[in-house]
């Protein structure tokens, strides 16, 4: 807090980066975060070894599936869940500009993961969507009567992209994939737009989240966090909205097994997509049961949150 408020009490601006286990941040030092925000602190909180399944060998004590939700409650906190290095760089640049160019008293909370993955080139014009909270990373490969939209965040985005490819090749489903860098920022603008529309009935505006997801295409959202995080934008999603999350206790196992257990892996995304289409009458009855059997997914398992 002293470093984050030095611009005020010492007229010596600093750019503090405080890196910690994401599980131990908002959960164990939340009072300090609130006090820092109330003191008009500026800086970056870096939630390292983030995610319920990414830190895969340390069980309940270290596996964070909820700090993004806790961060969303702090008015001055911007919470981010980047998937690629270019997203992280864009977010850091944006935060610096907000705090030191625009003199905004805000804290940026950024998820950092410890999983290696392929780094893809940044799409042209992606900066705007990254800062808004979501942007499209993969177009539908072909036109199809059946369409699905998949939202992914952090390391789970790679599974969303794999699922989209398999949906097209094996089921003829046209799929687009979005990287959601911040459900909190999408929600923040959505609430601002609702207030504007409530107070200005003749001057209605549409929030960015509605422009992205307000049509009737079924949407699947998946992340390494509990379902309540993607559910923050549910009211602005036009079509059916299915959320896959890591509700429950952390467990010690391989990432592959954990992601199958919490049903956020490629196969689980495919099943959720086919289910949305089958329920909407766009897939033959029995598609989900047949595909689940082929993939070895147990339809009658116990609730993973218990």
Provide a role label for each language-model segment.
Residues 53-66, 72, 79, 87-91, ...:
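Thiamine diphosphate
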Residues 15-20, 26-32, 36, 67, ...:
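Extended, hydrophobic alpha-helical segments in both membrane/secreted and soluble proteins
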Residues 40-44, 76-77, 217:
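Short glycine-/polar-rich loops that comprise or flank the Walker A/P-loop
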Residues 10-23, 44-47, 152:
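A short, small-residue-rich loop immediately preceding and capping a beta-strand
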Residues 1-12, 35-40, 72-74, 234-236:
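Alpha-helix C-terminal capping segments
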Residues 18-26, 48-50, 56, 60-61, ...:
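Active-site nucleophile and cofactor-binding loops and adjacent substrate-binding regions
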Residues 1-5, 29-33, 162-166:
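Histidine-anchored nucleotide/phosphate-binding helix
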Residues 34-52:
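A glycine-rich helix N-cap at a beta->alpha junction
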């Amino acid at each position: 807090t002293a470093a984050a408020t030095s611009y005020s009490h010492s007229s010596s601006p600093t750019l503090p980066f405080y890196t910690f286990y994401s599980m131990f941040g908002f959960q164990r030092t939340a009072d300090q975060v609130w006090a820092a925000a109330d003191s008009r602190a500026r800086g970056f909180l870096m939630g390292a070894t983030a995610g319920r399944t990414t830190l895969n060998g340390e069980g309940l004590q270290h596996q964070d599936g909820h700090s993004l939700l806790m961060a969303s409650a702090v008015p001055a906190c911007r919470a981010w869940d980047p998937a690629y290095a270019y997203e992280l760089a864009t977010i850091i640049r944006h935060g610096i500009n907000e705090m030191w160019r625009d003199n905004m008293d805000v804290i940026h909370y950024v998820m950092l993961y410890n999983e290696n993955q392929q780094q893809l080139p940044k799409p042209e014009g992606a900066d705007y969507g990254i800062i808004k909270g979501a942007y499209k990373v993969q177009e539908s490969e072909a036109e199809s009567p059946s369409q699905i939209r998949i939202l992914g965040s952090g390391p789970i985005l790679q599974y969303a992209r794999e699922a989209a490819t398999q949906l097209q090749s094996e089921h003829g489903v046209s799929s687009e994939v979005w990287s959601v860098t911040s459900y909190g920022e999408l929600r923040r603008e959505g609430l601002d737009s609702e207030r504007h529309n409530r107070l200005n009935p003749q001057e209605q505006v549409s929030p960015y989240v509605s422009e992205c997801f307000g049509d009737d295409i079924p949407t699947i959202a998946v992340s390494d966090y509990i379902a309540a995080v993607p559910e923050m934008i549910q009211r602005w999603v036009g079509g059916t909205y299915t959320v896959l999350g890591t509700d429950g206790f952390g467990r010690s196992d391989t990432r592959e097994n954990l992601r199958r257990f919490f049903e956020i892996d490629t196969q689980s995304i495919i099943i959720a997509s086919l289910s949305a289409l089958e329920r909407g009458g766009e897939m033959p009855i029995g598609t989900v049961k047949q595909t689940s059997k082929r993939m070895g997914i147990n339809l009658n398992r116990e609730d993973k949150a218990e």
